[in-house]
């Protein structure tokens, strides 16, 4: 019998070296031969044979290790391959290729190939089928619930698995389709205590190897591309996140922050009212700002920008209400009448994408009358910017889309556009446990006189919601007031204000103060889904927290009672309920006002809130360390309180006790006895006289070290216990706990996945699958647990609804998790990770229970009867349940608790010192569950009770005495720290670390002047005594606290930061070896307050000292090469493995160095240091003359860790060399990550394909030329923007063009070249940018939707209505809207977008170029140099910017030695320049800098009137241009259109500052904002940022080529610099560069129209696709405009506006460029609009005639274009129209200036009579026509109006009959015309006005003719106003009915009688004739009859 292993190859090795392999089986090892100088692959091709005596067992192992071989040192392990031989035993022969794993059990890239044969004597090898491996019998399910942290803890649970599976016994497959993993249990399954003693199996095989093998057995090679792969899920943590407890020390909320709210009021539409003069008021909090007033219009246009600045805590900010109101005819004397308002809170805006609403319509409603409906719309932008928020401003270009008001309402996503009015009922029943709020002096006086003892508080409740307040009555002198009142608010539903604030206040004669505050988030008490519910809550108790209960006149923590910051003590609890009722506003009996009103409500029963239960809280203090030394001199005790129970200093106010007795809940004797009677018999015996013990006995602290003390508890641990009575609402907390645990588990898993991705470990997708696996299992477990609960007492509506919705959500989440799990592939990990992060947010949201039950527990440290520091522990975290999942996460566990100072004291440096660290055990449960309260304590203690005797077993102990203790040694391997806080004025620190563990502490050595200390020190803590059972300490060891300090020569060390860690624990009986030991170095994040302050690289291990003493511990073998005295270095095996690296440094120059100690820097030098080695630059002899270095490249060699993540930082220091050999530190910079500077040799494969044949790049969609691949072809006609892969749109465009060529009529003529200018190009480009943005957004939305649909489709089991995640429905809604809108547009041909005229375009970047092109640091990097102490959060004034004292320009390149020779053998390799080949010289160079400033947008107002008078200031070196004369008056969006030329010399003048200042008539001008541009980096960048490459080459016209070098010259230069072959121009418009061929046009037209041959187009094609050129290609900067934010140093981090500009640079040693492009603002064109009012008809009749009561009107028509004040014109009056008909023949003439590109009229006028100069306004071109009734004595009456937008208005009707109201109401659906295109138009238009019901009605019709002429045309054919010459109009033929009673009675009779009674008269006449006929008939018939009869 023998086992033969054929070792074939090992591939994907890193670096170059000698390799050797070692193959081990049954303890016998063979070594392979040594392969020398292997690079990528080692071909061993060797066989090893083991003759064996006994059969090979299925679970025996084969191990192969691959090493780097070294003759001198020990061989270094590359990786290991281990394999279980089960498959070999069964099949006899196997070929395997698999990846190796490293020491950490992580798969690495290196792959091994082997072949194994097993020869048995009898040939008994079974055939092994796939099915067997995949099918696992169901009955085994239970046994595979292995622990999730088994990899971490090293515990191996292999019981119950069949032999021969993996060591873990984790069968990874079951029959596909059965649901893959056996369900992971959510709660941690407790294992028997002796489990771990089995010891760690030394070789844990990674579950993943099994997975891979299993796949291969099925003949599959790539594990993650196939469906089976989705089976591979890893549910154990891969990264060791457990060792990093995340403990936040400082309260995060409550600290004030800078906010800026900007509101742009653009316009209003459809305002309700007649002939109004509207003003818009924007109100935020107390501040109000108003727009200007617009006269006589219902759709005013404002475009005014307002800014509000705040400095408040976030919570206060987000609760502020933004109120937008429209007021009619407000002036100095009158406040005006309110038209309507719109309200939302700041938080709603902040939660929007980008923190803003852009161009949305706010719907106004009338707060005084809710039955009226919509009162109009205001279009506005609202943005909320916090410090450091970066807001992308959408470009302010096209406004066509936003006219659809309904589709663009200012509402968050998910809120329906039709909001209804609703009543919000807040019922206030009663309160309990109020603190006293008056000093007792007066009370004592009163008591002495009157003899009564009153409660010292007069409470009432204040409720605030949506900017309104309501309050209850005041209950005098009552600690337990009963109100039974309700506050009723009327507000739109859903409301846009998220929180409701309920506050108990104390009524006082001087000022009322808050007792406690509670916020109710409406989103948490409602659900907006299909099966959702309206906001509802209670009746439930809410707990209020705030300052401590002792009353002082000046309470320093009063803010806490107002709800700011975390409450530090229980204040009271309040019984409330909330309900909402949607109103039907049509019903008559409804109250129409929105005022808040109060009503009494009936009392509710005691039991409504749940059954009263007795709760028991037990706590034990196992350790109290790190007590701040300030309080270390007096005895200290700890007090634990829950509600008012346990509070001995200022707890229950005595008079209230009598009441408490009824409920059971106090401390007097009769109460106890009463309780005993109520309780069951045995309890009565047990509890005999159980009184609470809420505090520990005082004890004097003992010193730990110079900063901290500890309490000497040793083996005697004090305990506390409290009995309290609360309503039993544990179910709420249980559900919350389950969800919290699921969320914690999910968060841990996701952090792990992120860590795997970050550290580039293998298979993050498997871990993510495992996470989703666990999530879906946990969700289904939640549903079963939540379903079980049947206890209904005290259940509120919210409880029931919330449970239903939580179950629905969890079910759907579980389904989605299952679905997503199947979609996780290697390439989708990041996307899916984002999706799963949404789950986490949803879980956290669901877990937050809005209805409180048991108050939180507070632990106070008390010294000298004063409260010093506290910790607050949510009661749900320590709540006990028999079901594991429902138990609080800290219940019955020992936890580290850190105490902190209360309130504002906890902010800033004072709050950073730990006040005390407690190791504490807490348990809270029902008194009847009390038997379990000691269940989780570390075992080995005896109880010490207060009372001795029989029958008191159940009395809790007052202390525990531990007899069992374990002795440990802690080893803290402190390797290094990086990016520490700069604590000294030099900008550096002298850091040392202090490590605290239990009651011990030690320090590292102090390293001076560094922010990245490498201590490399092992701290050994001997004889650390820990109490408790060994196994528990192993699984959950105590926390280690590491604090970093800066050593100061004088005074005490300054705190730098703190981090926490947990050690890896080894018990005596465990083996010290892989995979758990030795521990790996890890980075721990250091925090200073809430700010990250660096990282610590360290490892910690806790080793149990057994009976053999320290001798048995693993030896400490440090490196032998250095002797550091008593300091132990970090031992081998833990310290990183080092390799030799060379670091090359490019020294370019220094810039902007500030003075040091008032002296200028003259002779600076740069020192570079990394890991103890370094290099110095050459000395700059005269910094002023030339700040560049003479020697460019230097290098040094250094040993660095092979693991890139452990690389130490590189330090850059600049020193100034002064006389007498002194040198002074100027500034320093630490490069924390060297990763981006690591040199990677160019990919050989990339070089090889250069020889495979030419690649032709083609631009046209025709079939590709068959040369090799693709071809670039640009005809002279194609579109300006060329992309290599033509996307769909472009193909469409091409098709369209071809159609056009075929002779189809083109809709819009090509614009004439002479008409076009630079601005045409600019506006066309902006439109393109907007279209691209829109397309991107649409694509993104579509992708998201598709993703949702995929998930929905795959999880089809979900009931249709449960599925949608929040926010999917509204999307669909908006999509429908869009599609209907599009349909509308397409049905009528006019609204379709006209095809864009062909204009050459440029690139508009809506950010600065630097962010688009990596700050132009492609080879030259800028390192900021810092000096001075870093600022903390509260030193708002010290920002990092202020610490910058200069910049070092240079670069780094590091690579492993030795370097391959190919690189150095390259042609022209300069050994002096190392890796920095082909870098230009850094000699001074003269450059012409040309700066183009286009415009600024959204400037911060600088004047009192809310405007600014901006002008441009440009600084570069000594040049300083102030364009003060050309300031632009009162503009926040000024168009500058200027260019400036400056000559500069690099490097002395390289920082360009462009600033916008505000011009002031008196005093100095203020800076609005500035932006800085580093021109040098741009100049030298490979992206060629000197002058943008235009899209087309033209020699004349608006798009003339502006670079002095033509494209062909540029291309030739680039090819030469990049050592490329080419350019070779060939026939047929081809050019070849390297191996690419480009095609393009070859002719050019000059000004005279002659065509000539040119290569420029071809060269330009190559330049525009330069990034595709192999090896040297990169994107060249196109012709562009960049948008840069303006910042003001006084308001750091908040944008003050934006500026659009670009910069060109031209070297002075080449031919000079042509003149600058003219970008001066377009002058508006002068037009004249002539409006002839011919007739009116059907005008409503307003006047009653004095004599006859007859209706008539005296009609005249008024019109204006710019504004009523500016150019109002009236016709004459048509008196006494009885029919509504009026004849005028009257001409209005309106001259105006018009900007075609912006479609705006430009007016210049003085803003007020006091204004210094005229202000320019741009307003839309709208013609207003109104019809009025003239009155002689009173004011004229307004009858109706029409407003025509001259760019698009409905075509007039041909006759008055066809003219209808629809022309106004359905304007969007009708075809529209533009007067600028039609020039002349005539027709009938309706006049409209609103009636009493605010509905539009027709009030008349007007026949008018509009005629537009340019100023020149108007001059040639002048006309007169009215009916005057020239070209007079004839007088109308009016019926003369004025004053005619006396003049012409007949005519008037005709008018009055005939007009009104004509039908009556006609009917009467007809009747008369009929009667006459009948009479004549009757009269003549007898005679006629006689005649007939007689036959006469």
UniProtKB/Swiss-Prot annotation:
Q: Where is this region: Disordered?
A: 655-699, 1288-1311, 1354-1399
Q: Binding positions for Ca(2+) 1?
A: 984, 990, 1046, 1048
Residue sites binding Ca(2+) 4 per the record = 1831, 1834, 1837
A molecular function annotated in GO for this UniProt entry is: calcium ion binding
Q: Which GO terms describe its cellular component?
A: basolateral plasma membrane; cell projection; endoplasmic reticulum membrane; Golgi membrane; presynaptic active zone membrane; synaptic vesicle membrane
Residues that, per the record, bind Ca(2+) 3: 1503, 1558, 1560, 1566
Question: Which residues take part in binding Ca(2+) 2?
Answer: 1503, 1509, 1558, 1560
Which residues pair up as cystines? none
Taken from the record's topology, the Extracellular segments are: 1980-1992
> Hey, which stretches end up on the Cytoplasmic side?
1-1958
Specify the protein's topology with respect to the membrane.
Single-pass type II membrane protein
Gene3D superfamilies, sorted: C2 domain (2.60.40.150)
Pfam families in the record, alphabetically? C2, dsrm_Ferlin, FerB, FerI, Ferlin_C
Q: Which residues cross the membrane?
A: 1959-1979
* Compositionally biased tracts (Basic and acidic residues): 1356-1399
Q: Which residues form the C2 domain?
A: 1-98, 241-362, 405-536, 952-1077, 1124-1250, 1470-1588, 1711-1860
Question: Is Glycosyltransferase among the key words of this record?
Answer: no
Q: Main role? A: Key calcium ion sensor involved in the Ca(2+)-triggered synaptic vesicle-plasma membrane fusion and in the control of neurotransmitter release at these output synapses.
The entry assigns this protein to a family as follows: Belongs to the ferlin family.
* Domains (record comment): The N-terminal first 124 residues can be classified as C2 domain, based on their 3D-structure. They are not sufficient for calcium ion or phospholipid binding.
Query: Which protein is depicted?
Result: Otoferlin
What's the source species for this entry?
Danio rerio (Zebrafish)
